[in-house]
Amino acid sequence: MKIVINSHAKSNIALQHLLESLKENDIDYCDVIVVIGGHYNLNNYEITKNENITYIRVNHNSIDFTGLITLLELYNNTNEYYVYLHDTCKIGKNFYNKIKSIDLTNVSSIKINKIFSMNIGIYSQKIINEFNDFLLSKKNTNENECMKYKSINYNEDYIFNNDKNNKVLDNYDGWNYTGPIDYYNTGTMRIVEYYPNFDLYKIKANWGQGHWTLNN
């Protein structure tokens, strides 16, 4: 499995925090793909590589779907699986062992939480290809439309919820969190959710507090 990080041009603080946690926990030998949305000036995908990390800068910002759209348009190995993360995540020391031990037999996607998975989890290239029309309908190349894509008819977990072979990792349905705090010292308050089944922390700015924010 490859690790895919969904990020944005304005989210470098969060991205570097996640990448540092990967390095601290010996994930240097994994293939990591970082998809960075919001580079509207680009005519096409811009791809660079640094050691085990491939950086893909893209000219759209499709919120959680930016990375999935990029995998749809650039990758075609139908035997591949991806661990899909937001840049506002941090991994624990058991993260790699947990993903390595997951049984992918007859599975095309895996949620990390039975209720809300925030599009975080495991996707096969096959299921990404199967939801081609849905993903392309979420492709946003207009910076001024981002909030609309976040808050109106957002379809969070749409692929997970419509994949007949989807599973929930360890059947987890808990909500373990701390905060809110200004986690990144950027002025944005966040809660920190912990998913023990994945050994993953999600640093979350939108948690049902009554308004949506795209601030970093």
What are these regions, as identified by a protein language model?
Residues 1-216:
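ER/Golgi luminal nucleotide-sugar-dependent glycosyltransferases, focusing on the catalytic module
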